[in-house]
Regions:
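Histidine-acidic metal/acid-base catalytic patches
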Residues: 1-124
Length: 124
């Protein structure tokens, strides 16, 4: 899929409640067409999200980079506000967490991301 609107087409092919999407925030943000928050709102309101990959990026394909969750183009505060507004009850998965320079680089990056997500959820 190259644009977020194509997800809508995919959902409309089969109206079964089992037809849900993996909502990768970074993948949708880096697509040519903007609209991450619009589609996040729509799909979470309609209970069409199986789970969310919570990651951030800067730029668009082919010139994008993965960033720390609090340092990209996506406003993660707005993401959590939208999910809360629509009573999203699904899974949020930290995804593509950058490593830190320490003895446990992946674990430290994951801990940072999980702490950030928990902080957003509790603050909003």
């Amino acid at each position: 899929l190259k644009n977020p609107s194509e997800y809508e087409r995919l959902i409309n092919i089969n109206k079964s409640p089992s037809n849900q999407i993996e909502m990768c925030l970074g993948s949708i943000q880096e697509m040519e067409e903007d609209g991450l928050e619009k589609y996040l709102d729509k799909f979470s309101k309609e209970d069409r999200i199986a789970y969310i990959h919570f990651r951030n990026v800067k730029g668009k394909i082919p010139n994008y980079v993965e960033t720390f969750v609090d340092d990209g183009d996506i406003n993660m505060v707005n993401v959590i506000k939208i999910l809360k507004k629509n009573n999203y009850q699904g899974i949020i998965i930290p995804d593509h967490t950058p490593s830190l320079s320490c003895d446990a680089p992946w674990h430290a990056g994951m801990a940072y991301t999980v702490g950030y997500i928990k902080g957003l959820i509790k603050s909003e």
